[in-house]
């Protein structure tokens, strides 16, 4: 067996890529900090029940599990930090007002989300708890766009959806849970033939307006005309009207900051835990979303304290492959002269100023120090910074 081999979709991050990821992380975290989001560091490993709180069966399948040798209970390696942040808000901070939290660390998946992705994403996210109004949805989405912008993502296409449109059709017509899940699966897969068969055979007693609305949902994808069609053809349920109003309000507010906004009223991603508006950000060069988010008001219920919540998360590894940040820094090569106090003082000042200074060790070949494009050279009794000669 070759001991240096890594499992599939697990990789080392080498210096240039690691530098780019770390630079983006600092830029994004600084953006979150100045908006009042407090940094938390949940554990990599905890009991499975906590990690699965408020999530669907998909999270259970994505999670690596081990038996705790101390308690005998099943533990999991986190596949998503959102439930952990919700646990911290609900059970540890336990405040009544608005709480803003952010996080940045690795998560681990049993299988990659996409064929081009890793099983160890570096997840960065922001969560806002304690406010149920559209204003907090707008704050989170604006913050996401600012984070993408400072990361070097220039062209952003935003998809907006709302879970309550589909859910209102289900609950307003009394559809049984087993049919709800079948309808959800058909819509999620965009399987219009299965959807048609369900509403005409399995649900033949369904109200005509609800039946037509369910069949229309996959077609409600596109620009702002989608909302006009939805208002015209969907049932006049109060929750549907409110959902469409929220989508319109957010789209108008965000329009100046994105290249394009698309509405998708059949987007049921995260249906098992999302409760309101959902969104996804895309950019050129990526066939999949670069950031996901939405409202999930019930997630804290599993920890004994349901709170309104909305947030987003993204994978810095994925983002780093799409950004135009490519300023891998060069350094200054200093000779090995431990007795030279003037040289030592100059090196110290350069490092304080943020410059990279590499001290060449005895026997080290300076030509191999490829990261350095300048030398410290003694000229006329003074140390000077000079370009590395050809």
Swiss-Prot record:
Record key words, sorted: Amino-acid biosynthesis, Cytoplasm, Histidine biosynthesis
Superkingdom classification of source: Bacteria
Pfam families: tRNA-synt_His
Coarse class of the protein's main subcellular location: cytoplasm
Listed SUPFAM superfamilies: Class II aaRS and biotin synthetases
Function: Required for the first step of histidine biosynthesis. May allow the feedback regulation of ATP phosphoribosyltransferase activity by histidine.
Subunit structure: Heteromultimer composed of HisG and HisZ subunits.
Protein name according to UniProt: ATP phosphoribosyltransferase regulatory subunit
Organism: Nitrosomonas eutropha (strain DSM 101675 / C91 / Nm57)
Lineage: Bacteria, Pseudomonadati, Pseudomonadota, Betaproteobacteria, Nitrosomonadales
